Amino acid sequence: MNDLKNAENGPDEADTPQGAPSQEPDPFVVLENLQAENTSLKDKLLRTLADMENLRRRTEKEVADAKTYGVTSFARDMLTFADNLHRALANVPAEARAKAEPAVQTLIEGLQLTERDFASRLERFGVKKIDPAGQKFDPNLHEALFEQPDESVPNGTVTQVIEPGYVIGERVLRPAKVGVSRGGPKG
């Protein structure tokens, strides 16, 4: 019966050998270990929170870029349409328009309206026209096709626009093709 009682209550002091080390760890060591673990977990938490914030910012930027630049290839293809429409209208001389029959005049007016409407729709999607006539040449926005001697304007000024350029957001969709002055005062 004593054996049963000892098994239920665990070993008593009489069963523990004299001089054996105590089984309980030092409370100061336990405290130091817990503080170190706490510091480590806080550090991991702060790093995880920072990673999540960076991921959120990066995702927001990617979504904004997708909205802004998602139509880039389509818009670039549509520029050919805009150029052709503009060239078609530019090739009808003003006197021919004035002498044209009313049906032809209505057709020309309809094409002009279509050109303006198309340009406004491009702008609605963030595509803006670059018309740099009279501005200083900027290789980021313009493509110089030729230089032209012109003493009346500063050197490096855009004197002629062969084909307008376009930007979408902060990016160049197509640089403006221009002629640049040479020989004037430094600009």
From Swiss-Prot:
GO terms for molecular function: adenyl-nucleotide exchange factor activity; protein homodimerization activity; protein-folding chaperone binding; unfolded protein binding. CDD domains: GrpE. The keyword Transmembrane helix does not apply. This is Protein GrpE. Keywords: Chaperone, Cytoplasm, Stress response. Pfam families: GrpE. Its main location: cytoplasm. It is found in: Cytoplasm. It comes from the Bacteria. Belongs to the GrpE family.
